[in-house]
UniProtKB/Swiss-Prot annotation:
GO biological processes: establishment of mitochondrion localization; mitochondrial genome maintenance; mitochondrial outer membrane translocase complex assembly; mitochondrion-endoplasmic reticulum membrane tethering; phospholipid transport; protein insertion into mitochondrial outer membrane
Function of the protein: Component of the ERMES/MDM complex, which serves as a molecular tether to connect the endoplasmic reticulum and mitochondria. Components of this complex are involved in the control of mitochondrial shape and protein biogenesis and may function in phospholipid exchange. MDM10 is involved in the late assembly steps of the general translocase of the mitochondrial outer membrane (TOM complex). Functions in the TOM40-specific route of the assembly of outer membrane beta-barrel proteins, including the association of TOM40 with the receptor TOM22 and small TOM proteins.
Membrane topology note: Multi-pass membrane protein
Compartment(s) of residence: Mitochondrion outer membrane
Annotated protein name in UniProt: Mitochondrial distribution and morphology protein 10
UniProt record similarity statement: Belongs to the MDM10 family.
Oligomer and partners: Component of the ER-mitochondria encounter structure (ERMES) or MDM complex, composed of MMM1, MDM10, MDM12 and MDM34. Associates with the mitochondrial outer membrane sorting assembly machinery SAM(core) complex.
Keywords, alphabetical: Membrane, Mitochondrion, Mitochondrion outer membrane, Transmembrane, Transmembrane beta strand
Cysteines paired by S-S bonds: none
Free-text comment on this protein's domains from its UniProt entry: Lacks alpha-helical transmembrane segments, suggesting that it resides in the membrane via beta-sheet conformations similar to those predicted for other outer membrane proteins and porin.
Coiled-coil regions, chain positions: none
Lineage of producing organism: Eukaryota, Fungi, Dikarya, Ascomycota, Pezizomycotina
Main location: mitochondrion
Length: 392
């Protein structure tokens, strides 16, 4: 489940019209959500608040052997009007799961960002600042986001920790998204790492208006999207590099059948080949599989996962109301009013099992999880934990 600050950052992307899914780093987002989720350990409590449309705070307290915690602050120059209260927030916005990719949208025109007053430009570029300190480790994380243009964004992330080389590291990303394609230029102070990533979407260009067909029957709707991408990076100090490439096909909302996503990624230097397949088998069920193979060592690994959304049943009195008023429909207080939670499960070929139950109780968001190892009969449970979130 997304924590409060991650959800606020996603709201900033949404308000500034930035598509986080149109990048090479998000190529396997669905498989990671269904197969790479972490089970909580111990007890963790988070209390957060959006004190103003531009300012948010969050406090976290945990107990895993020792008591630890963190304090977070976030500032956004762009007012965020979204409802972040844990009692009313849509669970689909905070629970990672099967991703339905939407149609590519045309980027905003540059002139639409301009604001003039008395013959002078007074507009400012949208900016987000975020800081988090971990106690008692005294580890500090910071994030700087700035929208440079409708198709360009600068992201600078920094970590200060005495356990890291040189006491910390800084990662800089210059991201460009034109709809049809996206690029990322990366530099990290760790080993002076430089990199480049790109993603290209085949099919119609959202920047070009479609031409009117001579006959209506000539219109062929696009039901899926095929994407190809690659990344290349090189460390100047350690004189080592790497690369990977990937393919993805996913259905779009107008697809008449079951939504599904297929990906294939290859790291030729390490010899790793990975393929994933995820399908939305029903309104409340999603299935996913991943097969990894190394053609240098001939080792392979298979993982299976699923998510099952639990929906509330009809109330005991609803049938009686419908008898009296056949046209009555139960009003929904929120988009996920009928959703009680989601159950996630994953298993690999070595007998390692992960279970996760996420949902809402009254005004609290909760995550209850366990990690098991079926091959160790004397100690099957590897970890058990629960996380509670409250936001106002």
């Amino acid at each position: 489940m997304l924590d409060f600050m991650d959800n606020v950052q996603h709201a900033f992307y949404e308000a500034s019209h930035w598509n986080v899914d149109n990048s090479y780093g998000a190529l396997n987002a669905t498989a990671r959500a269904l197969l790479d989720f972490d089970s909580p350990r111990g007890l963790r409590l988070q209390i957060s608040s959006l004190a103003a449309p531009n300012f948010a705070t969050s406090y976290t307290l945990g107990s895993v052997g020792v008591v630890d915690g963190s304090v977070s602050y976030l500032y956004s120059s762009l007012p965020l009007r979204k409802d972040f209260k844990s009692s009313r927030i849509d669970l689909h916005h905070v629970i990672r799961g099967f991703k339905h990719l939407q149609e590519l949208r045309k980027p905003d025109e540059k002139w639409s960002w301009e604001q003039w007053h008395a013959g002078r430009r007074v507009d400012r570029k949208d900016t987000l600042l975020y800081g988090r300190i971990f106690l008692p480790q005294s580890r500090l994380e910071a994030l700087y986001l700035r929208r440079l243009a409708p198709t360009r964004q600068l992201r600078i992330a920094a970590v200060s920790d005495s356990n890291l080389n040189n006491g910390g590291t800084i990662l800089t990303l210059l991201q460009t998204d034109s709809g049809k394609y996206s690029t990322e230029y990366m530099y990290s102070t760790d080993s002076a790492l430089m990199g480049l990533r790109g993603l290209y979407n085949f099919g119609p260009d959202p920047r070009v208006a479609p031409t009117e067909p001579t006959r209506p029957e000539q219109v062929e709707p696009v039901h899926g999207r095929f994407s190809a991408g690659a990344e290349l990076y090189y460390g100047i100090l350690n004189k080592s590099g790497g690369m990977s490439t990937g393919l993805r096909f996913t259905t779009l909302p107008n697809h008449p059948g079951f939504p599904y996503t297929m990906t294939l990624t290859l790291n030729p230097l390490m010899g790793n080949l990975s393929s994933t397949y995820a399908v939305k088998a029903g309104p409340s069920l999603a299935l996913c599989s991943r097969f990894d193979f190394n053609f240098y060592s001939y080792e392979s690994e298979l993982q299976l996962g699923c998510e099952l959304w639990r929906r509330r049943g009809n109330t005991d009195t609803e049938w009686a109301v419908k008898k009296l008023r056949p046209d009555w429909k139960r009003p929904a207080a929120s988009p996920d009013d009928d959703v009680a939670g989601v159950l996630k499960a994953k298993v690999d070929q070595d007998g390692r099992v992960g279970l996760l139950w996420e949902g809402r109780i009254k005004e609290l968001l909760f995550t209850l999880g366990a990690s098991l190892d079926l091959k160790k009969r004397e100690q099957i449970f590897r970890s058990v934990g629960i996380e509670l979130q409250y936001s106002s």
